[in-house]
Amino acid sequence: MSERATYAARRVLPDAPLLAAAEGRTPGRRPVWFMRQAGRSLPEYREIRSGIGMLESCFDPALVCEITMQPVRRHGVDAAILFSDIVVPLKAAGIDLDIVAGTGPVVANPVRSIADVAALPRLVPEEVGAVAQAVQLLTAELGSTPLIGFAGAPFTLASYLVEGGPSRNHERTKALMHSDPRTWHALLGTLADTTITFLQTQLRAGVDAIQLFDSWAGALSLAEYREFVLPHSERVFAEVESAKVPRIHFGVGTGELLGAMGEAGADVVGVDWRIPLDVAARRVGPGKALQGNLDPAVLFAGPAAVEKQVRRITAEADAALAAGATGHIFNLGHGVLPDTDPGALTALVELVHSL
């Protein structure tokens, strides 16, 4: 994967607040969007997804377009994020997995040996052609709103493959990385290739930014992250650098890893709700924008509590900017919870824009 991809001209969105903040320019307003904004919190999403499986939905370009647009229409957020799932490129490549309701991704044949790694199918762009088509539909419909593409980071994909599904302790994953580093790095190298192909496909189709989700990285120590994960995430960001779009890096529970995550090459580092943004800025170091970081559960506490926390976060973000951060994108510290009142999200967007 050493060759740098070439990308056709994409939309020019000089006034988009999200792109301005991500690129270190001054936005016309503080940008805000939400991870998992297209999802079960919206009644229109539940209606359109009725009877259609998650993975089936992700390979239907018209459905992906409609679901991605729903929160943009309803909330007035400053970005759309492509409706997909981090295991989509694995499924597209031919890995036997499914998303089981109430559980998450379940892998039929977990990866536990170098032979298992060698047997993994490699993703080719044509296998995610439906995703590219969805991106093209969206860029034609979104007007001046940027579209964020995304992929799962190699470590998080590896954890699903090694564990066979979601894991609380990641014991098999950690056992493999420590006991058999050769197999571990071969696996992450293969998954980095998959992630790169998936992101490059989205970039060629016209996404305006990308986010790399390392959902499970918070399970790692800093030493583990640096030795076993950072080189592979670093390669992903390097391989999409030539697209010249903002690159966002996010993980949950990664307060102690923020400095290393910042080194991976992203322009924006996502921060969960456990660490103040001004503290995060010192850990990440100057020259990066920050994204975050309202606790999703606060949205259940009522308008007064939400406003109090939003004002605290924006003040901490302003302190982060004074400390060397190059921008702030307001977001939650993780995804929108399924039972969140959509009206609370709309009000949150209006509040952030008013400050």
Curated annotation (Swiss-Prot):
Compartments where located: Cytoplasm
Superkingdom assignment: Bacteria
GO molecular function: uroporphyrinogen decarboxylase activity
Signal peptide positions (record): none
Keyword Cytoplasm on entry: yes
Site (Transition state stabilizer): D85
Key words of the record: Cytoplasm, Decarboxylase, Lyase, Porphyrin biosynthesis
Principal location class: cytoplasm
One GO cellular component, as annotated: cytosol
InterPro entries: UROD/MetE-like_sf (IPR038071), Uroporphyrinogen_deCO2ase_HemE (IPR006361), Uroporphyrinogen_deCOase (IPR000257)
PANTHER family (UniProt xref): METHYLTETRAHYDROFOLATE:HOMOCYSTEINE METHYLTRANSFERASE RELATED, UROPORPHYRINOGEN DECARBOXYLASE
Protein name: Uroporphyrinogen decarboxylase
Gene source species: Rhodococcus jostii (strain RHA1)
Gene field: hemE
